[in-house]
């Protein structure tokens, strides 16, 4: 656990022993990822869901429990490894690192803004923009985070924004299908939709494609002009 979490969270929060228990059950195709928790104080169900979907989990019921109130940070690592063994799908070290970073960053964000639901929704909205628009540069990712925060009416401290940008740069390198992302974390994205944030209209074209379309449109206009002579 310390191997994956040590860079992102104090050892006092991680604890000396992994006390959480994780159960992962594969469910029918299209059902999405659903997480329930009991006696977990640091991470919410939505935080786990966001991070697990980033790690590539699909169609699974995940139950995280503690013998008493515990942080539950080790549960993410346990859930990813259990899913990998159960399905035979390998989860790379980089992907596990990105998902772990995401979980901790979301928990820290929730503490900073005082609202776990808003923190979960901000991460989900910004992540969708980063992945669908293939954003990799810090300034572009920062704009995606800030625009998502504005849409949700959240004021995020600058130091937290910087941490989120660093985390999202890692997420941007993970091979995640955007449509699958929204389906697997459907509960969170439905909340965004209810809040009036429609991510279905996000422009997913990269800069190269936009430039190509621009010149294609010019060429088409020239052809139409000469065809009319």
Regions found by a protein language model. Name each.
Residues 1-63, 85:
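N-terminal, leucine/charged-rich tether regions that mediate assembly and partner docking
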Residues 26-34, 56-61, 104, 124-126, ...:
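Acidic/histidine-rich, surface-exposed loop or edge segments in extracytoplasmic proteins
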Residues 38, 69-72, 208:
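Conserved phosphate/pyrophosphate-binding and hydrolysis machinery centered on Walker-type P-loop NTPases
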Residues 43, 91, 114, 136, ...:
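Short coil/turn linker and secondary-structure boundary residues
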Residues 46, 50, 77, 81, ...:
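Solvent-exposed, polar/charged alpha-helical surfaces in well-ordered, non-transmembrane soluble domains
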Residues 53, 58-154:
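Soluble oligomerization/assembly scaffold segments of membrane-associated complexes
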Residues 154-229:
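Charged, long alpha-helical assembly modules
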């Amino acid at each position: 656990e310390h191997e994956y979490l040590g860079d992102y969270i104090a050892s006092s929060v991680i604890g000396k022993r992994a006390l959480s228990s994780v159960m992962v059950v594969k469910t029918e195709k299209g059902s999405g990822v659903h997480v329930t928790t009991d006696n977990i104080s640091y991470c919410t169900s939505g935080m786990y869901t966001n991070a697990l979907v980033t790690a590539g989990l699909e169609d699974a019921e995940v139950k995280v429990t503690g013998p008493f109130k515990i942080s539950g940070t080790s549960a993410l690592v346990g859930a990813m490894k259990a899913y990998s063994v159960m399905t035979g799908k390998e989860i790379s070290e980089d992907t596990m690192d990105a998902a772990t970073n995401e979980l901790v960053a979301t928990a820290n964000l929730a503490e900073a803004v005082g609202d776990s639901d808003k923190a979960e929704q901000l991460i989900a909205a910004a992540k969708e923009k980063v992945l669908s628009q293939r954003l990799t540069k810090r300034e572009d990712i920062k704009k995606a985070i800030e625009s998502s925060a504005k849409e949700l009416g959240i004021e995020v401290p600058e130091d937290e924004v910087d941490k989120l940008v660093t985390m999202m740069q890692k997420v941007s390198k993970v091979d995640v299908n955007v449509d699958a992302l929204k389906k697997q974390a459907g509960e969170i994205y439905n909340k965004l939709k209810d809040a009036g944030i429609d991510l279905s209209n996000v422009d997913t074209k990269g800069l190269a494609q936009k430039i190509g379309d621009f010149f294609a449109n010019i060429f088409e206009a020239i052809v139409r002009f000469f065809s009319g002579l």
